[in-house]
């Protein structure tokens, strides 16, 4: 800047240092006394607190409101688009544009339906394939579990170890032993009777021995009869020769 221009400009106003300090330094916060919880002051504080809570609740409600939208376009955006369309096309142009849009949508309705049907069929086929894969995996997984649960075959050469007796089997064995001992104590003649029954069938055989035909049996008297009657023997021989 030229010196003439500096001379023409007005001089800045004089500001004292105290005013500058006041402007720079923030005001000191004084400690306010605690409110008295008596009388009207309590009511005023209560109303203030309630109003603050209501304001906070209204803010949160406003934030949580979900705005409906069509193809990602909300209500205010649609209004703005409508106003711009009115300014650009005018009322008559908007009516014609709406008619053309309706005609195009009606013309594309069958194609849209076909696309929807194709998408549904594709989805159903995908679900079926996924379900078939899941079923096959489950069926393949079951035999593995069965094979894991199967026990190894026992070797024929190895003798099986006797299974430990259970408490019920031990009780049965003890009861049987007690019953047998009691029967033997009360009936001591049972072994003698059993021995007699075993010896009984052997005695008839000794009685039937002479009748079966031995050296000293009934064959001896037959021989005596044949020796005592030689005439009868001759007659029988003659009769056989005549025949």
Swiss-Prot record:
Disruption phenotype: Seedling lethality. Non-photosynthetic mutants possess near normal pigment levels but lack one or more elements of the electron transport activity in chloroplasts. Defects in protein targeting across chloroplast thylakoid membrane. Residues 68-69 are lumenal. It holds the Pfam family TatA_B_E. It is found in: Plastid, Chloroplast thylakoid membrane. Its main location: plastid. It is a single-pass membrane protein. Keywords: Chloroplast, Membrane, Plastid, Protein transport, Thylakoid, Transit peptide, Translocation, Transmembrane, Transmembrane helix, Transport. One of its GO terms (cellular component) is chloroplast thylakoid membrane. Disulfide bonds: none annotated. GO terms for molecular function: proton motive force dependent protein transmembrane transporter activity. Residues 129-165, 178-243 are annotated as: Disordered. Gene3D superfamilies: 1.20.5.3310. One of its GO terms (biological process) is protein transport by the Tat complex. Residues 135-152, 187-204 have a biased composition (Polar residues). The chain crosses the membrane at residues 70-90. Residues 91-243 are stromal. Residues 1-67 form a transit peptide. In thylakoid membranes, TATC and TATB form a large receptor complex, containing about eight TATC-TATB pairs, which binds the precursor protein. Twin arginine signal peptide promotes pH-triggered docking of TATA oligomers to TATC-TATB receptor complex, inducing a conformational switch of TATA that results in activation of the translocase. TATA dissociates from TATC-TATB upon completion of translocation. Belongs to the TatB family. Part of the twin-arginine translocation (Tat) system that transports large folded proteins containing a characteristic twin-arginine motif in their signal peptide across the thylakoid membrane. Involved in delta pH-dependent protein transport required for chloroplast development, especially thylakoid membrane formation. TATC and TATB mediate precursor recognition, whereas TATA facilitates translocation. This is Sec-independent protein translocase protein TATB, chloroplastic. It comes from Zea mays.
